[in-house]
């Protein structure tokens, strides 16, 4: 620490006396303009230092510098508990969560790429007629003048405008008006005549006029290359367009050229492209039917044809089963030979045209669309309303086919592609398209800046490992890691300098293959002049860091100290740092001595969801199985979109979530009684939720206190010892222990409740003691302390012991769930399953990256918990990139080989020892180093 005395706020951010959450009055110096990694066990205080102290103060000071008027629109920030922070800059936090639930937000809009695309298409897009495939153009005054000036000098041109008669006027009236306007001649019947001569001809003057039957002679001009000619031509062309309602003819040497001021071709008038024309968030550009959402509540094809492995004859179409509705099917079956429809072929093997025919029908049979329209017409009958509700769901809008834009927006092309083609491409394809876009001349000048911005942002998204996404992908369907990396790419695109970026495990959801690219992105963020602070457990990230800070030594009340601060090489030699011991190999997660054999399994046949290529995958039961693969390879589609909902349906616990596309599910499904998706979401939705209530130990503790003599004498029931119901809890703070005071333009202040002194309960409840402790004192105990305190209470002990087993001995019983990290929340859920023990149903537990936020030591404890669950007869299935987790698995399923369209295949299924010999597997290549031992 002696070195830190020399540090100045010019070179270092100096934090003095940080006391947020479990931080123990620590002093930390963070070097500026460096890549700094903060590491330590889950719950040690990393996030408290990075987010609740450093980011909170950087953001608060920036907001305080704004006017009170501006501040009312900003989130109000708490001042962190710290003596002082010197040398701090404005801070930007890029957290691990999906930032929006807006159904209109997409990857394109959130990264601003779509804004640039709208401008690009509005400025250089060519409108192509869907009838002839020719470009739609519109003439202007200047383009007509330029055409005339390019003719041979001395040529005489005649400008003619078609006479468009007003409703009800005869030829005589129109010609009289032309005379009043100063026109002298017209072309009528292929000859030029004076208007006065025609007016006197009674044979034709009273007849009805057709549009363009008479042409007004606007001017005759001799082409000379001088200003007078240019000015005269300009005036005459403008007059001609006005009189001809946007149309004009130019005659020279017997040739007649047509010019139009209108944007039309093939008898269709097209809209001129503007940025709003391509905006699905604007009524002008949005599809009229779905209003820019891309989906409508309509007939869901997946519900109409639930089993795609069946043929039409075999009952693939669910509403056409049964006697009455089966009549619709019979018409199709009987007439199928007439138009060569394969009624015995599985639905999934039909061509796109054949599938479309089932919906549209033809002259021989009525399709599904007509069938449902007839049901709609009879909704006054309850049986039809019930039937319709069975097949309703969110479906792609039939008008825009899910692209959200009005149909004519797709007529505008750049490089032969419409804007909807671009947003449906994987990002790497879109980047390649724009890099090789052939533009010349004026187009290049207009598009240069726009293309630079588009290419930059696409490049950043590919660099952070998101090349498999599309710009049309909804933001609320992204994982936390994907969402964070999109924010990171957006920050890079904005080129901010002189700020502090605080990131929460950006490597989550990223295969080790892509981690190196992410590191180079973070370094480029540092190199432009920013301080990048990353909370991270990934070894590669630590190796790349300029500076490491290890918070610990353990978690919760046993953490909150700065164990180490220095370089990667220095931490390898540090004996106090647990992180250093794992990095240097002194401590490690051992490879299991033997893998569990298995005989039962569940198989998914023909998985087609998203990018999956119709694969068959076997999932072993009563084992620890890991699904691996690079980002975007199809792991989540396989496990969360197909296996999870399909199993729920099979065992009768269907949640209503739409199942992904697959052919069949087979195997020992009867061996599974329950399916649990264990995520890292908070364990409760309110600040009242805490570990002791979640594992149901508080019920036993309340019963114990209600059984004490003073409680019996006062007639107190167990409910009196609850802070969630009225009776024994403090009436002022309603059992919260604290009150919130709202401050205008400043952060709300949270103070201990004056009535109960932060104890949550009324005095008569606090007077009841067990072993000299009140219920309020018990809530302040850590799990470790509570296990000693309740050693003679087996019921309470049985519910607290699993919390200690999963490594949460340091957590206080009454700690609010809102202060728990994602890893801690997940392990509390695990403990609740361990508590059920042998009494629980045989369960398949599905985890999506359970190592998020976990230190090497935490992963060791998590693996022990997995072993305990499997010993109880359960099965564990994990989607994971962490090599320590993969090497500990009994069975590995590798999906890939790449992300997006190049993925979705089953690369490998077998033992980890065999995976390292699979040449096509990136996971196998990285696993080699971890299986040497």
What are these language model-derived features?
Residues 1-933:
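Conserved phosphate-binding elements of NTP-dependent enzyme cores
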């Amino acid at each position: 620490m002696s070195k830190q005395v020399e540090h100045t706020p010019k070179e270092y951010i100096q934090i003095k006396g940080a006391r947020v959450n479990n931080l123990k009055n620590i002093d930390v110096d963070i070097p500026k303009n460096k890549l700094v990694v903060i590491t330590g066990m889950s719950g040690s205080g990393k996030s408290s230092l990075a987010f609740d102290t450093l980011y909170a103060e950087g953001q608060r000071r920036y907001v305080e510098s704004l006017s009170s008027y501006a501040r009312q629109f900003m989130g109000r920030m708490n001042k962190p508990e710290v003596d002082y922070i010197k040398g701090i800059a404005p801070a930007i936090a890029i957290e691990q969560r999906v930032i929006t639930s807006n159904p209109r937000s997409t990857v394109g809009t959130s990264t601003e790429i779509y804004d640039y695309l709208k401008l690009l298409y509005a400025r250089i897009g060519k409108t192509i007629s869907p009838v002839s495939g020719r470009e739609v153009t519109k003439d202007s005054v200047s383009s007509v003048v330029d055409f005339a000036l390019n003719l041979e000098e001395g040529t005489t041109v005649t400008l003619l405008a078609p006479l468009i008669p007003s409703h009800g006027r005869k030829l005589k009236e129109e010609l009289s008006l032309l005379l009043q306007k100063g026109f002298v001649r017209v072309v009528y019947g292929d000859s030029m005549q004076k208007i006065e001569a025609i007016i006197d001809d009674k044979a034709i003057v009273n007849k009805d006029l057709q549009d363009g039957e008479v042409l007004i002679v606007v001017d005759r001009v001799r082409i000379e290359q001088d200003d007078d000619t240019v000015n005269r031509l300009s005036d005459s062309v403008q007059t001609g367009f006005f009189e001809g309602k946007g149309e004009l003819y130019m005659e020279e040497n017997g040739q007649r050229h047509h010019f139009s001021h209108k944007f039309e071709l093939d008898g269709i008038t097209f809209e001129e492209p503007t940025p709003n024309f391509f905006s699905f968030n604007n009524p002008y550009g949005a599809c009229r039917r779905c209003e820019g959402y891309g989906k409508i509540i309509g007939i869901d094809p997946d519900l109409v044809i639930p089993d795609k492995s069946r043929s039409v004859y075999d009952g693939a179409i669910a509403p056409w089963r049964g006697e009455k509705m089966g009549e619709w099917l019979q018409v199709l079956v009987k007439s199928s030979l007439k138009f060569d429809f394969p009624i015995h072929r599985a639905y999934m093997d039909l061509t796109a045209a054949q599938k479309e025919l089932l919906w549209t029908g033809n002259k021989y049979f009525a399709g599904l669309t007509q069938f449902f329209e007839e049901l709609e017409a009879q909704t006054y009958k309850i049986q039809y309303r019930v039937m319709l509700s069975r097949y309703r769901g969110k479906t792609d809008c039939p008008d825009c086919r899910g692209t959200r834009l009005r149909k004519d927006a797709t007529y505008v092309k750049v490089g032969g592609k419409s804007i909807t083609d671009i947003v449906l491409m994987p990002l790497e394809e879109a980047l390649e398209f724009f890099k090789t876009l052939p533009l010349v001349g004026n187009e290049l000048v207009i598009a240069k800046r726009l293309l630079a911005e588009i290419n930059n942002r696409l490049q950043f998204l590919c660099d952070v490992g998101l090349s498999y996404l599309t710009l049309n992908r909804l933001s609320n369907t992204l994982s936390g890691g994907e969402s964070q990396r999109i924010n990171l790419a957006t920050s890079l695109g904005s080129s901010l300098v002189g700020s502090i970026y605080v990131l929460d495990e950006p490597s989550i959801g990223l295969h080790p293959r892509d981690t190196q690219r992410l590191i180079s992105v973070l370094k480029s963020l540092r190199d432009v002049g920013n301080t990048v602070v990353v909370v991270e457990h990934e070894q590669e990230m630590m190796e790349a860091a300029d500076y490491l800070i290890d918070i610990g030594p353990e978690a919760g009340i046993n953490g909150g100290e700065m164990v180490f601060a220095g370089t990667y090489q220095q931490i390898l030699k540090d004996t106090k740092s647990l992180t250093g011991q794992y990095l240097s190999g002194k401590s490690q997660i051992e490879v299991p001595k033997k893998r569990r054999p298995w005989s039962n399994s569940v198989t998914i046949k023909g998985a087609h969801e998203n990018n999956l290529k119709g694969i068959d995958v076997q999932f072993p039961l009563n084992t620890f199985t890991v699904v691996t693969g690079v980002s975007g390879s199809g792991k989540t589609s396989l496990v969360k979109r197909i296996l999870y909902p399909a199993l729920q349906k099979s065992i009768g616990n269907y949640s209503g979530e739409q199942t992904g596309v697959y052919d069949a599910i087979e195997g020992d499904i009867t061996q599974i009684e329950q399916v649990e998706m264990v995520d890292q979401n908070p364990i409760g939705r309110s600040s009242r939720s805490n570990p002791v209530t979640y594992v149901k130990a508080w019920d036993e503790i309340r019963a114990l206190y209600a059984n004490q003599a003073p409680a019996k004498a006062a007639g107190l029931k167990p409910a009196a010892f609850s802070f969630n119901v009225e009776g024994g809890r403090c009436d002022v703070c309603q059992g919260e222990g604290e009150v919130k005071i709202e401050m205008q333009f400043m952060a709300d202040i949270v103070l201990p409740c004056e009535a109960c002194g932060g104890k949550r309960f009324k005095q008569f409840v606090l007077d009841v003691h067990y072993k000299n402790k009140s219920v309020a004192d018990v809530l302040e105990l850590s799990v470790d302390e509570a296990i000693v305190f309740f050693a003679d209470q087996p019921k309470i002990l049985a519910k607290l012991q699993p919390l200690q087993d999963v490594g949460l001995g340091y957590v206080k019983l009454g700690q609010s769930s809102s202060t728990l990290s994602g890893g801690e929340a997940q392990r509390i859920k695990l403990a609740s399953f361990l508590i059920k023990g042998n009494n629980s149903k045989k369960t398949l537990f599905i985890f999506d990256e359970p190592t998020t936020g976990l230190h090497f030591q935490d992963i060791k404890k998590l693996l022990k918990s997995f072993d305990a669950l499997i010993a109880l007869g359960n099965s564990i299935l994990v989607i994971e990139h962490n090599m320590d987790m993969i090497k500990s698995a009994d069975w590995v399923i590798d999906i890939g080989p790449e992300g997006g369209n190049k993925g979705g295949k089953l690369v490998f299924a077998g033992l980890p020892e065999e995976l390292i010999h699979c040449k096509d597997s990136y996971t196998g290549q990285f696993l080699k180093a971890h299986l040497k031992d």
